[in-house]
């Protein structure tokens, strides 16, 4: 029977694989902490998170005395407590067991759902085990309490079509995987999720490089030979180390270990071919260099950005394939020529960097009166390797780089230059004043001077100045959030009339939004956006209600 969702925005229809659930009853308007627990689950309408009067922060802090007064107040409703749980901040997620217990005390059924995200308390508990933001111990305590009360492990969120085990695998919480599978039916461990190409929890762990969760799933009988909708086994969805950026040596090491683990777990009787990822382990390093017209000791350009001296070429212990080791001119590297206790070459600390062979080209010093242009050199075809985004150092204008494979791909992907007029998040118009790495967040960021005072700063963040603009005219955004709307300009243009939408961008491991879209658009896209929607939309909704 189809469930009627009383929430303002109903989630999309359930997938074919979702288990049948009991029909929900209408939500009581004012549940009491002393009320007896209902016999059937309901869907609670969305509500804003309560905050103390004149509170200095925009999020709820259960450690604050004023917030504790609200948390333990019998008049605080279940929808309001669900709104608190949705806040993706450590202060809230570390207290998931305390908040969850308060929800249960108010007569909440163990399988009740949050009307905004269609998630149950067990879903939230599994999400709260995420390392860095959540607390696995608190998440396990609440999960054990919910399971003892009869929580259904097979229930799925209709936004993501994920059950509790999928969330635990996605956020790499092995302790929760063990708790969930302890008394679950055998088919739960191999239950699939349509948002991950109908892959199992093991597929989800493999694609997210969750080594701990993958090991735990295999220990509990997960099928390593199960194929998803694309015909891939879990080992085949592990990200390829050759596609990773220059400074992802640790992630490459995890990918190699995880892929080996999953390959070896495939039964010998199963006629499955080994995973066919690009592998150049048997190609001598000198042949690779000869194909590039290089030799050890040559000056090289790394990804069209960093210059250094080629010190190593060959196979490594941290990832499959051929890698080059470069001693950089500046201390912008990651090591001293050794990774994981294995030394490949010697250089000063922070000046060693490893990269795939396709990301280097021979560097040629330019004549004083001409523009640098590196001659073309023979290159091997690495069709699966893509170059990193461009980088511009603070305080310096970037000179034209050599037409290497990486730099050509950078130009194709480039969105805007310094001085270009852009549209930020589809709403705010401004001029690019900065592009490069920052101290406040990893990756490459655009610094934009907005036409209107709707920004956050004057070009400086945490005492570090990246560009100069009037107060509240500065804002930073990743490349995915901007759109070039004109050529280079020195003065701001007229602002484009657009409806103002208050937005808070929340960060989770390995996941970002691309543009501002309606909830319907977000729900219809890939699993990453739909999963993060559960955390992001409540913040935007709360900002709208306050305005």
Swiss-Prot record:
Residue(s) carrying Phosphothreonine: 374
Biased composition (Basic residues): 387-399
Residues with lipid group (S-palmitoyl cysteine): 534-535
Post-translational modification: Palmitoylation by ZDHHC17 regulates association with the plasma membrane.
Biased composition (Acidic residues): 16-27
Membrane topology: Lipid-anchor
ANK repeat locations: 117-155, 160-189, 197-226
GO cellular component: cell cortex; early endosome membrane; Golgi stack; membrane raft; microtubule plus-end; nucleus; plasma membrane; recycling endosome membrane
Entry keyword annotation includes Cell membrane: yes
SUPFAM superfamilies referenced in this protein's UniProt entry, alphabetically: Ankyrin repeat, Cap-Gly domain
Region of interest (Disordered), ranges: 1-49, 365-413
Role of this protein: Functions as a cytoplasmic linker protein. Involved in TGN-endosome dynamics. May modulate the cellular compartmentalization of AKT kinase family and promote its cell membrane localization, thereby playing a role in glucose transport in adipocytes.
Oligomeric form and interacting partners: Homodimer. Interacts with AKT1 and AKT2; when AKT1 and AKT2 are phosphorylated and activated, affinity is higher for AKT2. Interacts with ZDHHC13 (via ANK repeats). Interacts with ZDHHC17 (via ANK repeats).
Identification of the protein by name: CAP-Gly domain-containing linker protein 3
Provenance organism: Pongo abelii
Origin organism lineage: Eukaryota, Metazoa, Chordata, Craniata, Vertebrata
